Every structure is written in structure tokens, then in C-alpha cells.
Amino acid sequence: MEELQEYFKKDRSPQQHFLYPLLLQEYIYTLAHDDSLNGSIFYEPIEFIGYDNKFSLVLVKRLIIRMYQQNFLIYLVNDSNQNRFGGHSNYFYSHFFYSQMVSKGFSVIVEIPFSLRLVSSSEEKEIPKSQNLGSIHSIFPFLEDKLSHLNNVSDILIPHPIHFEILVQILQCWIQDVPSLHLLRFFLHKYQNLNKTIQSNKTIYVFSKENKRLFWFLHNSYVSECEFLLVFFHKQSCYLRSTSSGAFLERSHFYGKMEHIIIVCCNNFQKTLWPVKDPLIHYVRYQGKAILASRGTHLLMKKWRYYFVNFWQYYFHFWSQPYRMHINSLLNYSFYFMGYLLGVLINPYAVKNQMLENSFLIDTVINKFDTIIPIIPLIGSLSKAKFCTFSGHPISKPIWADLLDFDIIDRFGRICRNLSHYHSGSSKKQSLYRIKYILRLSCARTLARKHKSTVRALLQRLGSGLLEEFFTEEEQVLSFFFPKTTLFTLHGSHRERIWSLDIIRINDLVNN
């Protein structure tokens, strides 16, 4: 544990001491309002009650003047919390609005130390900037290349929710600005008290809805602390000193294990040669779920689970259930990750070998990475969104029946195209056809409900124009490059995988 503590101290960047005065600067609130400057595509705009959602410098200046008053921020948080459900007065509107402004501005400020650290580390490692690396689909080619050669996989659920004070202590290691940390405690205390007014198990939900930027920042800070353990143990257990990005920057330096009397000299290998093609451990995470895969034995994976559970208990001071980490063999197990069911298929092949006059057959096995669309969770998501029943029977969408015909078709078509675009990497697309069928028929039933007609009469009147809205761009491109095969028809091939490098978030229907 002492070695672990030294590792944590060594890896810390210089702490920031003067963040709190930035709350008195107007440009901070301009940055917080303009999400496009920060690439905040994940954050939906918040609609303030009783106010137009437009940015106003007058309100910002008024807020800054009031913040110069003594204990204004304390009263702001407390009054906003007490009056949220106490009536719709102008006093409540103004305090709630100011509280939201300060909260969003504070979110921008606390990101500054981490942004500087990220930029400096990328410049030191000379990591090339590429927009394609921002796509979450870029994870799947890595899994496709590595997963078929591994033996065991551990499906990890990162522990949540945790106490808010633990989040403050995590930031305290990076930020030593005491007023900023106290202000963060006030905001977290506000949502905790608001939780008591609504329900006892909705704290994280309310917090993430009202201030997504701050919520995801705290969440990523917490997950970053969890991943420090993985990097530490990986450096302690490997021959090569590797980095968290997986690149062997010091590939010419080797270390021998003296207990086995094995000393590997760097002179025996060329610097461009990779003596170990694959690391022992592969780690992939998205949001609160992670995958730890290894070529090692089942006992090795149990040791890693033991390390994780004990680390969470020691460092974060809370009990972590071992059942959050499932260890299974990749050949007999499929796990749900990022909207796909991932697994490894065993494909037997018979190879004919002929030597002079003798010929014989050699049976061989090839492991293949398999991606399946989970049809049951998708139908459940469509059912929650009122597109079908729990059994998958399409129904109309009454809430959209008052829209124009073009808007109704466009909304259904956009959902269908997004789902098809995201699941283009599936090796079996039969399930995707059922989802398309549900959305098409739900669209037709919605239009028939609006015009007080039947689906048959509506389709006869509209013709094939209704179906063209559900024809995805991938199908058009593939039909151009592969004219001899109908890839996306029911009688064609269904196993072509396409990983799109422009997807930066999971569709809400997929993520349910």
C-alpha cells in the first residue's frame, strides 16, 4: 500500500490554487452558455422556468455584483433549495436561475486544471490528433483484433452511487482552492436535500438532469481514480514498462524477474521488434461499464478481481460487491457492451493437405469475433418510448399525431437511420430488420390515426415513398460499391460489418 500511495503522489500534476476568483469573470459564463465552444454535444440545454433560455450579459453582470456581497452564494444555494417547491414567485425564479448560472460557470472552472493536464500530456507523448479517435465505434475494431485471441473476460460494473464527499476528496488531490471545494459541497448538498423532497433514490438522477456538465466531470474524475489502479498493477506485473495508452514507448528496456533467474537483455532484440505482440491484459471502458480481458488463466482473473475489490474498499472507503465483476470464458459467454452482445465464435475448418501421393485432411479451428444486436433490450426500449407493445407489436404514437405528415415520417425515419447506422457493425442483421419493421408500421399506424384511416388505405395512397425514408445511407453506399450482392435484403448477406467513425454517443434507445 505504501508503494501504491507513492505512485499516486508521483502521478499528480501541480495543484491549482486560484480558481474561485474566476467566478467573477464574465467570459466564464459565456463559455458555459456556448456549448459549441467546448464540444458539449452530450449536454442538452436547460430550460429555466419563467425565463427565456437566451444568454444575457445583463444578468451575468447582475449576478457578479451580487456575488461580491457577503455570503451571497450560501444564501443562493439554500434559498433555491428551500423555495423550489414553495410556490412560483419571481423570487424563486431569480434565485433558481442564478443558481443554475453559477453551477454551469463552476463546471467550466473546475475543468480547467484537467484540460491543461490533458493537453500537456498529449503534447509530451506526441499523440496525433484525429477526429476518428473520438468515435465510440473505434473501440470495436480494437476488440475485433484482440478479443478472438484471449481466453477470459471480466465484465465490470464500476461501483455507484458513492457518497458525494468522496467526489470532493478526489478533486482535493488536484485542486487546493478551498473556496471552490466548499462551493462544490454546497451544490452537492443542494441536490442531496432536493433528493429528500422527491425520492430517496433519485439523487444522482436529479443531479445529472440539472447539471450534466458537472455530473459527467465528477463521474469521469471518479472513474479516472479507479483506473489508476489498473495502470499501477499493470506496470508492476509486466516485463515491459508500458503506458496507459497501450503503446510500448520503452520497448528496448526490459526487466528480469530475479526469483525465476530470468534476465532478458535488450541487446538480444532489435528496437523495432516486438517480443511480446499483445499485452497480458486488455482494458476497455465506456461510462460505468468496463471489460478486462486476458490470455491468462481463470485464477489470474480472480486475482485481478481481488485487487479491484480491496482497492475500492481501501481507497474509497466503501464496500464493493464482488458480484459486480463477472469472470467468464470468452468461448462460452456473450456480454452486453455499448448496445451489442459481444462474444467469440468457434468456426471449425477442414484443410486438405497433399504431400506427393498422399493427401489428408487437417481439422483446424478459427476463433471469430461476433457482434449481435440484442433484440429484446431494443424492443423493450421501443416499448418504453410507446412505439410498440412489450411483445414487439407495433402501435401508433398518439403524441405525434398532431404533427405534419412530413414531420411524422421524418422523425420515424431519423430514429430508424440512427439505429441502423449505429448497429451497422453487427454480423447478423436479421434483428435489425425487425426493428425497422416495428418503426415502419408504427409510423403507418400514426399517420392512419391522424387521417382516421386504415394502414392498408394509407399505404396504397402513399406508395413506396414511406419506405424510402427508412432507407439508410449505408445501404445506398454498399449497393454502389457491391452491386452484385444485395447486402441489406432479407435474402442477401448479413455478415458485413461496418464501423462508423462519426458516432460520438449512443442513441437513447440503445442505451436503455
Swiss-Prot record:
- A GO biological process held by the record: tRNA processing
UniProt keyword annotations, A-Z: Chloroplast, mRNA processing, Plastid, RNA-binding, tRNA processing
Major site of localization recorded for this protein? plastid
- Would I find Chloroplast among this entry's keywords? yes
Report one GO cellular component: chloroplast
Give the top-rank taxon of the lineage listed in the UniProt record for this protein. Answer: Eukaryota
Tell where it localizes: Plastid, Chloroplast
Recorded GO molecular functions are:
RNA binding
Taken from the record, one Pfam family name reads Intron_maturas2
Instruction: Provide the function of this protein.
Output: Usually encoded in the trnK tRNA gene intron. Probably assists in splicing its own and other chloroplast group II introns.
What family does the database annotate? Belongs to the intron maturase 2 family. MatK subfamily.
The name under which this protein is listed is Maturase K
Species name for this entry?
Lilium henryi
Q: What is the lineage of its organism?
A: Eukaryota, Viridiplantae, Streptophyta, Embryophyta, Tracheophyta
Q: Which gene encodes it?
A: matK
